[in-house]
């Protein structure tokens, strides 16, 4: 079995009396596409935010790439990529400029920067639009650019929070074609949240979450 790259034990997040995440235990293995499936308000985004160090757990332990998310959040952030649920690109910049800014923030060496940007634009089939302002992109193109940006600093793990939310079925399928190619070429582990049942079929394993608790874990076939 591949090594564990994400581990949570008794993970809890409370907001006053509201328990958004209620004692989650999970393990994700290297190279997996792991899906977090559940309705809105189930605790998916709260969990992913704790694993990405954007929220501090109320209780429990979480390790990402072997690193405690509370004790060394900066080291965790260097090893992960994150594609947010809401758009976070600068529409006034070009595709290349958005990636250049991200590469600078993550201290990607200047000698590597141009090569990596070209590689990711090519992998996401955006090379011909590298010099176009992002405001001219379709929703699917913007999502592909966000994925390219999330992979630019070569993370071990890519977190995707509702990666195809608001996209039409054909565009959603295209995004998953690109994600599978990315996993195949880069060996990245993908942890994604979704409330689309059909999207869970793309995952190696799924955890179903409801009211802040994991109610089932298994392959798509096992959970049918």
Model regions and ranges:
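Catalytic Walker B motif of ABC-type/P-loop ATPase nucleotide-binding domains
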Residues: 158-161
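Helical segment within the ABC ATPase nucleotide-binding domain
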Residues: 173-186
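ABC ATPase "signature
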Residues: 217-218
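Conserved catalytic motifs of ABC-family nucleotide-binding domains
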Residues: 154
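Conserved ABC ATPase "signature" region
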Residues: 100, 104, 111-129
């Amino acid at each position: 079995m591949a090594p564990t790259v994400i581990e949570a034990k008794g993970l809890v997040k409370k907001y006053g009396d509201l328990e958004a995440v209620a004692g989650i235990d999970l393990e994700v293995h290297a190279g997996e596409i792991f899906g977090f499936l559940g309705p809105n308000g189930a605790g998916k985004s709260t969990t992913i935010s704790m694993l990405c160090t954007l929220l501090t757990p109320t209780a429990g332990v979480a390790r990402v790439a072997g690193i405690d998310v509370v004790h060394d959040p900066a080291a965790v952030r260097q090893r992960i990529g994150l594609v947010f649920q809401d758009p976070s690109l600068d529409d006034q910049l070009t595709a290349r400029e958005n990636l250049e800014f991200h590469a600078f923030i993550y201290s990607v060496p200047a000698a590597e920067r141009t090569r990596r940007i070209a590689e990711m634009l090519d992998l996401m089939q955006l090379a011909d639009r590298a010099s176009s302002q992002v405001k001219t992109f379709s929703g699917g193109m913007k999502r592909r650019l966000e994925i390219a940006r999330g992979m630019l600093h070569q993370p071990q793990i890519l977190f995707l929070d509702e990666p195809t939310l608001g996209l039409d079925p054909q565009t959603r399928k295209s995004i998953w074609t690109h994600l599978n190619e990315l996993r195949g070429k880069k060996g990245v582990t993908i942890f994604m949240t979704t409330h689309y049942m059909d999207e869970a079929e793309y995952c190696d394993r799924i955890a179903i979450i409801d009211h802040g608790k994991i109610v089932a874990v298994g392959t798509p076939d096992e959970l049918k």
